[in-house]
Regions:
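Core of folded catalytic or high-affinity ligand/protein-binding domains
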Residues: 57, 61, 76-268
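Short hydrophobic helices that act as membrane-entry/anchoring signals
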Residues: 66-70, 74-77
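N-terminal mitochondrial targeting presequence
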Residues: 1-62
Length: 280
């Protein structure tokens, strides 16, 4: 178990403390020491490690204890620096064991969501025709999505692939959530500054139930000024919560087939209320 924990943490970029040479159970053995000193138990651990199969490309099998350690470490780092997208991604995967199956079930019971699960579309530069989207009319989803990317200097290729979700279908669900995150900014009319990110996290927390979104919504405001906190509390959070409750599941929209649809029309279809007239 210790060997498995060290390997998963190392691959995830999370450092672990190593016990000293005088610790019980030979816990201080380094990876460079002869394997013979590990005895029969070490061979069994190695066999156990080899028995953890990858469920999809990039998958890192982890135990519940490893997930707990990764969740704790990534939560601390994500709260310290909310723009550490790698830590936010690890936190989402290691704490979404209840929310992700619920989201998958919603997709399976919706015609458009079910088709998305079957076809597995991806939103990245290799699948997007950016030139065509730029030529769409102002106000259309495709044109406003590209405008959001360019105005905020972000790329759809920055979304990290899933690693720690121990189910291939659920791994796609969280990948899809990540790739439509910028679509949520577009539909909600929110920029990528801290205030805009907090508002989107409130909406997503209500929509998805992902603990990572809840933590971002709850602790993100600590970095805001008093004026922005007032706007957030009186205008933006109530609107985000009402919209999140009223809206249908955001993962049940095949956005790639809605590029020509006006943003206002799609908001109305999903159930998102018009954004408040405040400066974000």
């Amino acid at each position: 178990m210790l060997l498995l924990l060290r390997r998963a943490a190392a691959r995830a970029g999370v450092p672990l403390l190593r016990a000293g040479p005088g610790s019980p159970g030979n816990a201080g053995l380094s990876r460079s020491e002869p394997r013979a000193r590990r005895g029969r138990g070490g061979e069994e651990e190695e066999e156990e490690d080899e028995g953890c199969y990858q469920l999809y490309p990039g998958h890192i099998p982890t135990s519940p204890l490893q997930k707990a350690l990764l969740a704790a470490g990534s939560a601390v780092m994500a709260l310290y620096d909310p723009y550490r997208h790698d830590m936010v991604a690890v936190l989402g995967e290691t704490t979404g064991c209840l929310a992700l199956p619920n989201l998958r079930d919603k997709m399976k019971h919706h015609p458009e969501g079910y088709r998305i699960l079957q076809e597995r579309p991806r939103i990245c530069l290799s699948t997007l025709d950016m030139s065509r989207l730029r030529e769409l009319p102002d106000g259309s989803l495709g044109r406003e999505y590209v405008r959001f990317l360019e105005d905020n200097k972000v790329s759809p290729d920055t979304r990290m692939p899933a690693k720690f979700v121990d189910d291939e279908e659920l791994a796609y669900v969280i990948q899809r959530y990540r790739e439509v995150h910028d679509m949520m900014h577009t539909l909600l009319g929110m920029p990528t500054n801290m205030l805009g990110e907090v508002v989107v996290k409130w909406f997503e927390a209500v929509q998805t139930g992902l603990p990572m979104c809840v933590l971002g919504a709850a602790f993100g405001p600590v970095r805001l000024s008093a004026r922005k906190l007032q706007v957030l509390a009186t205008e933006l959070v109530p609107w985000a919560i009402r919209s999140g409750r009223n809206a249908s599941c955001i993962l049940n929209v095949y956005y790639e087939q809605r590029w020509e649809q006006p943003v206002e029309s799609l908001r109305e279809e999903i159930g998102i209320f018009p954004p408040p007239a405040v400066c974000v």
